[in-house]
């Protein structure tokens, strides 16, 4: 007999989908069960600014959404100290609110389940006057931020958490701060003595299983520039300081080819109009060049430690059972 789609949809939790509708009743039940399992795999991504979810990790987020995993994003600031790369896209006074709108667009482009904005202020790069702003994220009380992140973990109960590597990709103070706060929250969320007030209010300790850091290999900026220049783009070579950015290649556990999700990642990036200059080259270069530069992402598995000889799976949820 035919499967009654509407009847089954009424019993699915938020975020679950039916893969097929024209199937037998028995198969329909099996498909729902599989989709429920996939939907019970959860990833929490914790970053500092609008566009942090786009440029370095957009492919991984898109691939997990496409696989039916539940993906939630937490962003700590509005990126008020970012550049305005499109003339007329914003003013210094309006940039934060414009970037709020851009972030909402990016979340929809990636298909994320939900998003939380903590609304600290962008601290700017090290040495900027913005470092001294009382609302700057780097001046936030560590206890308060970590308590909030532990609450996020205990509420959403992710098996996998994603943030920046401890150096913040290129030394951005906010990137370094979110890495520190997220790592500490990962380690504390399972401890019933940590933030016991949360347990008194009905939350339970939760032990996420894996923590991944977004990273880039040292020398990546020069590789990118050479690739784009070879494709005919007048792309600037990195500065001496930029050549120092990145992690030693041996520290990176995963180099992922996520080019199958390049269109989704590019759509997410282009939501951040204030951050994409008219000279942005990736929509002009040949597809294989865009795939090489934008379709590759790099990750370090920070928890659990990777013992010598272990090959880290390309699937960040590999062998994790839904719960």
Residue ranges and their predicted role:
Residues 2, 9-10, 40, 163:
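N-terminal hydrophobic alpha-helix used for membrane targeting or insertion
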Residues 4, 12, 17-18:
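Short hydrophobic targeting helices and cationic amphipathic motifs
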Residues 30-156, 183-184, 191, 300-301, ...:
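Active-site rim/loop-helix segments in enzyme catalytic domains that contact anionic ligands
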